[in-house]
Amino acid sequence: MNILENINTEKRNPRSLHLDSMSIAEAVSLMIDEEYGVIEALKEQHRNITEVILATSYSLKNGGRIVYIGAGTSGRLGILDAVECPPTFSVDYNTIVGLIAGGEKAFIQAQEGAEDDANFGKEDLQSINLTAKDIVVGIAASGRTPYVIGALEYANSIGATTVAISCTKQAKISKYAKYSIEAVPGPEVLTGSTRLKAGTTQKLILNMISTLSMVSVGKVYQNLMVDVKPTNQKLIERSKNIICEATGVDYTTAEKFYLKANKSVKVAIVMILNDCDYEKALAILKNNNNFIKS
């Protein structure tokens, strides 16, 4: 039996049948045009994406974690999104977690066969002490990866919330999740190479999940990353500029309050907006569940 026969990501793209004989310029134009399918796929899944983000936000607000899990490109994209959150939002590295079939070494070198064992998905979730407060986001472009199915089955068994993200309709993994996103950008220019449009589609979904979940817990003021962690010179300067933008003060004043606030952008903004000292600003934030109220 051909298990890939009816999977969207395995179909041939009629527009790229002669990819091997196109000029580079023609192929570039084709690949650019094909990306429009990504946006259409996301628009079609607007309601489902919204429901997932409401669920991930609920988990974070109630002390849970967002756990991405996938194999190959899907797993790497989950890790990529997860590791960007601590410097951007000053969250713990355990708040948004990325797991990949085959372990960390699989991020840079493919681990053959790791995705084919459902038990590995279960074991990886057990290794991070998954709880019912957490939400597990299974990612599989083909919608059928055993590693992801095993993870979702285990998550369901302990009462964790489950999400399935795929790039094919009637995906097998959707049957194992409370919420599902089936965003289908169309056949790949290079048949079956889901690191292309499917990967782009998944990355944009993860961007929305992490960013808007962080907005929901007060990590953003207006459209400013007020909980940024200033770990290098660029981020230090960005921190001061954020204070300027949020409060209207000049650079020198922003720098002064940045230091007074122990290099916390959020606290500095509250100090300026409320004309108060450091301790009072902390109390205001605590009273507002760490949201800046203008």
Swiss-Prot record:
Coiled coil: none annotated. Keywords: Carbohydrate metabolism, Lyase. One of its GO terms (molecular function) is ether hydrolase activity. The keyword Lyase applies. PROSITE patterns: GCKR, SIS. The active site is at residues 84, 115. Belongs to the GCKR-like family. MurNAc-6-P etherase subfamily. PANTHER family: GLUCOKINASE REGULATORY PROTEIN. A lyase-type mechanism (elimination/hydration) is suggested for the cleavage of the lactyl ether bond of MurNAc 6-phosphate, with the formation of an alpha,beta-unsaturated aldehyde intermediate with (E)-stereochemistry, followed by the syn addition of water to give product. Specifically catalyzes the cleavage of the D-lactyl ether substituent of MurNAc 6-phosphate, producing GlcNAc 6-phosphate and D-lactate. Together with AnmK, is also required for the utilization of anhydro-N-acetylmuramic acid (anhMurNAc) either imported from the medium or derived from its own cell wall murein, and thus plays a role in cell wall recycling. This is N-acetylmuramic acid 6-phosphate etherase.
